Amino acid sequence: MVCGDANTMKCENFYPICPREMSIVIEIINENCDYHTTTENCQDKIFTVLDKNRRPTMYHECDDIIYVYDRVTGIIIDFKNIKSAKKYKLCHNRYSESGRVIMKEMEKLQSRGWTCLNEPCRNPWCVLAPKELADVYAEINAENNAENKPN
């Protein structure tokens, strides 16, 4: 699984200490994650979404994306300078199968009181983009596709 610190942990063995107590050996299966940080995050109900390289990157550098706003309403009406997925190597596409799995896991964790440590992403199709931004992007894409559709 790609999402969450808990998914980088593996509980290997249970060792009986006495009839009523057990010792558990927990190890981190992702070499990019620190044991102490991971266990503290889990205790504090905090998670991170790992990037495509399975690293806990907090900020995606998608600063080249330009939002075009309506002058009167202040609402985003278009996006400029969005590159291909190859340009945004850290972003998980929320519309891909793996992206949908990550989104579902994020929603489940947040509904249980967990907090995501990652910064919101400016890339509207990234799983870390704010929902409102992703919705506007999807709506604009649908409108553009409808306009370009042959009659």
UniProtKB/Swiss-Prot annotation:
Family membership noted in the UniProt record: Belongs to the mimivirus R69 family.
Name assigned to this protein: Uncharacterized protein L781
